From Swiss-Prot:
Protein name (database record): DNA ligase
Named cofactor requirement(s): Mg(2+); Mn(2+)
Binding site residues for Zn(2+): 420, 423, 438, 444
Organism in which the protein naturally occurs: Ruegeria sp. (strain TM1040) (Silicibacter sp.)
Organismal lineage: Bacteria, Pseudomonadati, Pseudomonadota, Alphaproteobacteria, Rhodobacterales
Catalytic activities: NAD(+) + (deoxyribonucleotide)n-3'-hydroxyl + 5'-phospho-(deoxyribonucleotide)m = (deoxyribonucleotide)n+m + AMP + beta-nicotinamide D-nucleotide
UniProt-listed Enzyme Commission number(s): 6.5.1.2
PROSITE patterns: BRCT, DNA_LIGASE_N1, DNA_LIGASE_N2
CDD domains hit by this protein: BRCT_DNA_ligase_like, LIGANc
Catalytic residues in the record: 119 (n6-amp-lysine intermediate)
Residue ranges of domain BRCT in the record: 660-739
Keywords: DNA damage, DNA repair, DNA replication, Ligase, Magnesium, Manganese, Metal-binding, NAD, Zinc
Pfam families to which the protein is assigned, alphabetical: BRCT, DNA_ligase_aden, DNA_ligase_OB, DNA_ligase_ZBD, HHH_2
Biological role stated in the UniProt entry: DNA ligase that catalyzes the formation of phosphodiester linkages between 5'-phosphoryl and 3'-hydroxyl groups in double-stranded DNA using NAD as a coenzyme and as the energy source for the reaction. It is essential for DNA replication and repair of damaged DNA.
Amino acid sequence: MDEADARAEFEALQTKIEKADHDYHQKDAPTLSDADYDRLKRRYLALADAFPILAKDGTRVASVGAPAASGFGKVTHAQRMMSLGNAFEDQDVEDFAVGLRRYLGLSSEAPLAFTAEPKIDGLSLSLRYEAGKLVQAATRGDGAVGENVTENARTISDIPQEISGAPEVLEVRGEVYMSHADFEALNARHAETGGKIFANPRNAAAGSLRQLDAEITRARPLRFFAYSWGELSEPLAETQIDAIERLASLGFQTNPLTRCCEQISELLAHYHAIEEQRADLGYDIDGVVYKVNDLSLQERLGFRSTTPRWAIAHKFPAELAWTHLEGIDIQVGRTGALSPVARLHPVTVGGVVVSNATLHNEDYIAGLDSKGAPIRGGKDIRVGDWVQIYRAGDVIPKVADVDLSRRPEGTERYAFPTRCPRCDSPAVREEGDAVRRCSGGLICPAQAVEKLKHFVSRAAFDIEGLGAKQVEQFHSDGWVKEPADIFELQQRYGSGLQQLKNREGWGEKSASALFAAIEDKRRIEFARLIFGLGIRHVGEVAAKDLALHFRTWSALAEAADLARAAALAHRAADEAEIVERQEAQASARRAKISEARNAAVATCAVAPDSQAAWDDLISVDGLGPTVALSLSDAFANPEERAAFDRLIAHLEIIEPDAPADDSPVAGKTVVFTGTLEKMTRAEAKARAEALGAKVSGSVSKKTDILVAGPGAGSKAAKAAELGIQTLDEDGWLDLIGQA
């Protein structure tokens, strides 16, 4: 798979994961099973690992869950509520343990114990106690900010209002759930009274906890299992298992199936034992969680962006179901991507009613992968087919297979549209791209609306009271066609307040609040502005890096303009390479490709200042040519550039703070080589990055410091040749103040 194919799949997965997170965390109505979500997330992370530039461009890798809903007060967690990495096979668990030993520098014989406990399928909750009293309860939200549900949590009998013998500050974390018996009784009562019928216990628990009226929550039979903690004024214990026992002694319910295991074989045996008991537990679980038992090792292992290194969830297998494919709908995204969605006869999969499933792209429908190789045995998907649906997480369900024996006579292969279903512009599939895209740009109403939704999203302008629903309404009414229109709403409509408050769903208070929120966002951080523009491939992380590098809008725009000629030369070279790759014989492929690229570059020679601007763009902390090309295309497109300019006229852009300068290695490029004796390579890398250094795997002119242990070899020789500062391990620790 090349980068273009990987990027197309990565973006599609990102969109699905965002929607699934929203459905699960905000609507309490997941559209996918746990198994499908995990499979999608696993593929997403695998692509990010194989193509690091994608991880930089992506936004969802660095987030957990979904933002807090607007109906509750917001709570900023003192310590983030993290998600968990996933394992799906026994081998994944063994690989997890091997990776931990490698990170910690432990031999295969050294002891490394784990705890194992059921993974409850409910709603995560953080309980804060101060001086023994419950003072706050908050949902996970997006991991950093959750919803204040304190009064509702007080109604749950498993949650103590006061505790004695606890640290002065104690945040207890766990899962709110509903037992099968209580769930069935609740639905039976609702059926009799005409109330809402819940699809599964998880939805019932989440919907019950997130009631604006705490008395409704009180009437719902919610339970709580404690399994972790957040902020502490003093440690609970030295091991995970002892800490859980300490929580139990304080009056919290902990899961009786929690075990401490010395060997991986014990973990796996306990997993399979729990799996066998699953149907008889009386509550929903979707796997088993393993955690390193020694809390000092947990501290050494630390965290990735959204998950702890010291824990993993071993998920149960996906659930499958067969149903009838009633139609194929085409959705158009903000970058013009045409995404096919299967319209299904509703079927229950894993306790969730599924009526739609992703079909990825036209190749997937045709039974081919992006290289033209057959998938599903080459079986295509047709309207009228019986298809197998699976859910492996909380994400959009997927069509896994087709039953040809039940295919109706007279069905025809699906003809993927070559024109946009929304604006009738040509839908073009570029060489090397798995996705067909509408070429209409901003004249396409679907793209315009999706871009506006992106513009007001949480990571972009985050305008209170202006969400996806309001954007659709304003666009349909002709009030907002592009981002600049948002800041002209009140001005252009004169008595805008009066016009808005007279519309359905709006009153004087909500209209005034919206205009105030819009005014508040005229001052905007540069990174949020860049991200909010919705430029293809420019994710949240890439936007921050661009903002830090260029610092002002004028500098970024000037660089994009100046680099345009070089960008076009780069694209011409790539296209020549693709043509030659298709035609070249295998035995001479490399030579011919090189010859074609060099010839293309020679015929597209550009001015030195344009080449320098291009080199500057692609050097932005590993941004790469794909993102740089998208940026160049956006600024060179007359309609988009004009829309940018109209928007900028309304804004005061806040420049990013200068990078931290309080570390002797901040901003420097460091390379580690040879054997390190006082820390593992992974620990050294993590510490250097925490101090603001960039860690590279190879020595170059850009390297500032080489840390060389015994057996440094060629890297030390090259560093000496380039005159690069070289330190031994003790010298490095002394430099960073950890000797």
